[in-house]
Regions:
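Glycine-rich Rossmann-fold phosphate-binding loop(s) that bind the pyrophosphate
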Residues: 11-12
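Short, flexible coil/linker segments at domain boundaries that flank nucleotide/cofactor-interacting
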Residues: 1-2, 112
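N-terminal Rossmann-fold NAD(P) dinucleotide-binding loop
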Residues: 16-17
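Conserved hydrophobic helix-helix packing surfaces used for dimerization/oligomerization
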Residues: 6-7
Length: 129
């Protein structure tokens, strides 16, 4: 398995992919973990899945330093995990943490105490305690 510096969970989305491209441009080896196989295939083929100014150029420059996958085992072998997921709201405008907690249930066996975990989401302070 190829070594990466950073794993971006939700990495094929409108927040995760541009962040991954920026990190790649700073010579970080980035793995993008996502569940959208269609978007993963586009990224790995050098196709930007959405409009992002300068995105196509960044994606195709030094492509060996970025890889998109739906294989969760890549999370385990990185120093930094950045979680980029949205937080939907209920009809009462309160955060709905259902998907957030579901994601971390899936991730928990693939995280370790030596990793830096960054939550890049619209959750409020104290949500992760």
């Amino acid at each position: 398995m190829k070594k990466f510096d950073v794993c971006i969970v939700g990495g094929a989305g409108h927040i995760g992919l541009p962040l991954g491209l920026l990190l790649k441009s700073k010579n970080k080896r980035v793995v993008l973990y996502d569940k959208n196989t269609n978007t993963i295939n586009k990224i790995n083929s050098g196709i930007m899945p959405f409009l992002e100014k300068g995105g196509k150029k960044l994606l195709n420059h030094n492509r060996k330093n970025i890889f998109a996958t739906n294989d969760i085992k890549y999370v385990k072998n990185v120093k930094i995990v950045i979680v980029c997921i949205g937080t939907p709201i209920t009809k009462n405008l309160k955060p709905n943490f259902k998907y957030f907690f579901k994601l971390f249930k899936e991730l928990k066996n693939h995280l370790n105490h030596n990793q830096v975990i960054i939550i890049r989401s619209s959750i409020y302070p104290g949500s992760c305690e």
